[in-house]
Amino acid sequence: MVTPQHAQELSTGARELGIDLSEAQHEQLLAYLALLIKWNKAYNLTAVRNPDEMVSRHLLDSLSVVPFIEGTRWMDVGSGGGMPGIPMAILFPERNISLLDSNGKKTRFQTQVKLELKLDNLEVIHSRAENYQPDVPFDGIISRAFSSLEDFAGWTRHMGDVNTRWLAMKGLHPADELVALPSDFHLDSAQALTVPGCQGQRHLLILRRTA
């Protein structure tokens, strides 16, 4: 159940992140949270079981990457419960956001969210990353707790080109993973993120293809 405390935490946290949510966006994010809480009991969408932790660890964590979203077509790989792709679709109705996951339960949940929240800019794809072939390269490809940087780059290489930005949301700065980055990728920048209500470290690594 979504409480007034959750609503206040979302409003305050978004402001701390420099994001001015409209009333409609605030309501949509809370409606998404309500669906996540409801479906998580049966579908195991997230390891976070306590609804009181979901605003910071899911919604605000997803919103923390908003300043780094450029371009019109984005892919959220291994989206799971829809993070960060669904919050991105709510914040950016003018952008096309695709969610990709190989787990049928999770894509069914994502489809339900799309229908209930009327997110016409959201596409749900049930597939493994290496098997999905887009018609044109994405402007950006993002993942949150999906895999190692090596696998993230390797499994999604074909979805982008030299103009694409790969955004990997991580906890601790993964220096060991950067060493194993495929030779045709390089680190463009690394950002330390501060997420309201989250105690642990958060980092965003932005990768580019060199060829």
Swiss-Prot record:
Which family does the record claim for this protein?
Belongs to the methyltransferase superfamily. RNA methyltransferase RsmG family.
Per UniProt, which keywords does this protein have? Answer: Cytoplasm, Methyltransferase, rRNA processing, S-adenosyl-L-methionine, Transferase
Q: Does the keyword S-adenosyl-L-methionine apply?
A: yes
Protein name as annotated: Ribosomal RNA small subunit methyltransferase G
Q: What EC number(s) has UniProt assigned to this enzyme? A: 2.1.1.170
Entry function: Specifically methylates the N7 position of guanine in position 527 of 16S rRNA.
- GO cellular component entries: cytosol
Enumerate the Gene3D superfamilies for this protein. Answer: Vaccinia Virus protein VP39 (3.40.50.150)
Chief location category: cytoplasm
Keyword match Methyltransferase: yes
Q: Please tell me where S-adenosyl-L-methionine binds in this chain.
A: G78, M83, A129, E130, R144
The family database entries (InterPro entries) matched by this protein are listed as: rRNA_ssu_MeTfrase_G, SAM-dependent_MTases_sf
Q: What class of enzyme is it?
A: transferase
Q: Which NCBIfam families match?
A: rsmG_gidB
PANTHER family documented for this protein: S-ADENOSYL-L-METHIONINE-DEPENDENT METHYLTRANSFERASES SUPERFAMILY PROTEIN (PTHR31760:SF0)
> What is this enzyme's catalytic activity, as reactions?
guanosine(527) in 16S rRNA + S-adenosyl-L-methionine = N(7)-methylguanosine(527) in 16S rRNA + S-adenosyl-L-homocysteine
Q: Where in the cell is it found?
A: Cytoplasm
The terms under GO molecular function for this entry are: rRNA (guanine-N7-)-methyltransferase activity
